[in-house]
């Protein structure tokens, strides 16, 4: 199935849910497939992991896809771009931009063992934050019929990050507001609290849930 995903991306095939004998039965299977898929892509591109994405951080999106938690994915080092980068649409099947608050991990957070990380642990481990975009490729998915386990297996559609200037985290990051403009016209607005109430809660979920490697200094 991981090889099939790679082929779909290589040919820019339309996103299709895995079904029948290939149906993904639970979230554990979904993340196992994700790791296999990403491992192949890393091997092909001679790349490494630079960090993680966290998706479905709003209750509305979780309800839409029938899941009660966020989802995660890996970000590859060669897919990190700096502000001002030019991205070719032809490199994607259907590229999308998602506005993000990007955090930079300032000290290692080893994999959870006996005690889960608290909010204060996360807050003290983050060295700086940046506005940015996540690049996704939904491959013309039918949003009325998305299997969340297939989405997770497909690395949650992540195709990289565009990173702005990092600054020390504001005292009230939950209250920070952002505006997306196109040609001077406001398209959308949002605030830090839209992400699980505070962006650091999303990082807390990630540190406690997803990664066997832990979060390392320098990770996004």
Where are the model-predicted features located?
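Catalytic-core "active-site belt" of small-molecule-metabolizing enzymes
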Residues: 1-198, 212
